[in-house]
């Protein structure tokens, strides 16, 4: 099943969310015209400074022990996410 994770149009933001019993902390940072992510899973930082790309799984390595798929998708085309379209043009999707 697919779920949309609420995200605001801020250049830098941090939020916590529980995804299917997994404690997740997202930190998104804007550098120039690119969006980067730090990700903490169950109190263990597993990603530090990964660039966010359109339709690319953000937590793709099995050794992270993350259950599911997490990605941004462009609802109006095929561009990589930038902060001023988050939550509208670019939505953050979790698939369990």
Predicted regions and their residues:
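Short beta-strand/loop motifs in extracellular/secreted proteins, especially
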Residues: 13-15, 35, 89-90
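Short, charged/polar N-terminal "headpieces" of proteins
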Residues: 1-25
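Acidic, aromatic-enriched beta-alpha/helix-loop junctions
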Residues: 30-75
